[in-house]
Regions:
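N-terminal basic/disordered segments at the start of proteins
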Residues: 2-63
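N-terminal, charged/glycine-rich beta-strand/loop interface patches
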Residues: 32-34, 44-46, 58-132
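Conserved small/polar residues in nucleotide/adenosyl-binding loops
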Residues: 135-137
């Protein structure tokens, strides 16, 4: 499934201005489901890339686009899956990305889930605002 396009109808057309972050934002902490320490890096990406999660702890790293085609049904959390590779609890991170107007970013995480933080989107918003000099691409 990794060959599927990373854009969908809710994302801007390539002819429209798109935005990414100007640097790397980071969120660290424990995951909710597994409880392990994880780090999420919010990295710039080129126009048309979309929002893509990367499991950097795997060799080779596996990328999973944040589109509905990769969503799987799990209780009380949003999970993206490509084959056996999952990224869990992505909902607050994706809310922050969308709310901050980011169209393209590589979200690199070194484990199977996103850090919980305080249970809201705020830690992700803060990480984005740290590198929020948005680049129009």
């Amino acid at each position: 499934m990794n060959d599927v396009a990373t854009t969908n109808q809710s994302e801007p057309a390539l002819s429209e201005p798109q935005q990414t972050v100007a640097g790397v934002g980071m969120v660290q902490g424990r995951g909710l489901m597994h409880g392990s320490e994880v780090e999420l890096q919010i990295q710039p990406a080129p126009a048309g890339h979309g929002i893509v999660f990367e499991r950097s702890d795997l060799d080779p790293p596996v990328r999973i686009p944040a589109v509905v085609d990769y969503a799987v049904d799990r209780d009380r959390r949003t999970v993206l899956c490509d084959g056996e590779v999952v990224v869990e609890t992505v909902e607050h991170c994706l809310s922050a990305i969308r709310g901050c107007g980011i169209d393209n970013a590589l979200l690199s995480v070194n484990g199977p889930e996103i850090p919980l933080g305080d249970g809201s989107a705020d830690p992700f918003v803060q990480a984005i605002q740290d590198v929020l000099s948005l680049i129009h691409i």
